Amino acid sequence: MPLLPRRFRKGVFYLSKISVIGAGSVGATIANDLMIQGVASEIVLIDVNKQKAMGEALDIYQGAPFHSPAIVRSGDYEDAAGSDIVVITCGIARKPGMSRLDLAQTNVNILKQITPQIVKYAPDAIYILVSNPVDILTYVFTKISGLPERQIIGSGTILDTSRLRYDLSHHYKIAQKNIHAYVYGEHGDTSFIPWSLADISGCSLHEFEELMLKKGAIDYRVHPGLTLKYVQK
């Protein structure tokens, strides 16, 4: 079990607190993962639907004895006071046929409503925005919150990057942890992949494919410890 992180502020050590705004599938999953990883001593779920936030928090908290001793609870914006990190996931979900930009105005309006309330109680927190369209919402949050840019992070193309590595892992039958590839740009239709930066265990994709053809590999399965040394002649 990982040790709960300790922070140093005003001469004393204290345990960390993370608030998640939005108790939908994304917010609840993030809160659950935070509990499993043991990265916070207190996790607060905040949602306009208080009953849903309470239910999700209880489900997560009841699983805590098997993972970490973190406190998981629901609350209001004032309960986010003292948070080290605030994750914003609220907003409407994308429906079939909608682009991320179609969500822009609705989710911008939602963000405008919650920003003054959360910033009032957690002005020193690091804010991580996950809601779509994430690039636009991160920009809007920066403008209306009045917080320094160093306190604001957008999830960007991390999900796109994760999906890319999954696809490459599936294609080459190589463990994802040995694949290094990235998606750049916005989280949307204009993102792109710099293939020249992609590699598998230090080999470019072109080099890896040539190696597989040259060696006549007969067995390279997905395995947690797989490296190129397992390529057989």
Task: Explain the meaning of each model-derived region.
Residues 42, 46-83, 98:
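Conserved N-terminal Rossmann-fold NAD(P) cofactor-binding segment
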Residues 17, 84-85, 126:
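Structural motif
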Residues 13-56:
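NAD(P)+-binding Rossmann beta1-loop-alpha1 motif at the extreme N-terminus of oxidoreductases
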Residues 145-151, 160-233:
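C-terminal substrate-binding/catalytic lobe of Rossmann-fold NAD(P)-dependent dehydrogenases
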Residues 3-14:
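Short, Lys/Arg-enriched N-terminal segments with co-localized hydrophobic residues
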Residues 99-165:
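Rossmann-like NAD(P)(H) cofactor-binding subdomain of soluble oxidoreductases
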Residues 86-88, 129-130:
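Redox-cofactor binding/interface segments in oxidoreductases and associated redox assembly factors
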Residues 90-92:
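Conserved NAD(P)H cofactor-binding loop of Rossmann-fold oxidoreductase domains
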